[in-house]
Amino acid sequence: VLILGSAGIGKSELALDLVSRGHALVADDSPVLTQQADGRWLGRCLFPLQDFLEVRGLGILNIRRLFGDRAICAEHPLDLVIRLEDAPSRPEDRLAGAWRDYRLGGHAVPELPLTVRGGRNLALLVETAARLRACGAGEGIGYNAGQELSRRLEEHLGKESL
């Protein structure tokens, strides 16, 4: 997951929350993205920056020292982009979500904008987005709960009108 957003919006704090939940950090501010032969992108961190995360108020953290080796991942394919926003960039389809494509070198990566507001559990939303992505969300294929709900309602309403 690549987390994007303006300075100070909470990207590093979200990354720290995800690490505390058992996920691994690839890079903080300067991920190196390399396009593979199949068109997909692979993210990694330059060695001098590896293991470190800067969190406002806490300073520089050595994630490997705080959470162990499992908390650092040397490289990982880019499967999902999360964009943290102060306000929604466009109206959201409440059934399908706000999925869109993040274009990178001619390759589309599913992107999900998340509005940052007090009381939202962003780590849980990112974990759920990753699960949805694994089911094909954001690709125009795969499982879509909104479509299933619409289908069930149409079937139910159709039976009642008979």
Region annotations inferred by a language model:
Residues D79-L162:
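Conserved NTP phosphate-binding and transfer environment spanning the P-loop NTPase/kinase superfamily
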Residues V1-V26:
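Glycine-rich phosphate-binding P-loop
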Residues A24-D86:
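Conserved nucleotide-sensing/catalytic segment adjacent to the nucleotide-binding pocket
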Residues D17, L25, F47, A74, ...:
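A generic structural signal for short, solvent-exposed coil/turn residues
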Residues K11-E13, G22, C45-L46, L61-R64, ...:
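Short, low-complexity, polar/charged sequence segments that are solvent-exposed and flexible
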Residues S6, P48, V116-R117:
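A short, sequence-level motif marking secondary-structure junctions
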Residues G5, G10-E13, C73-V81, E160-S161:
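Short secondary-structure transition/capping segments
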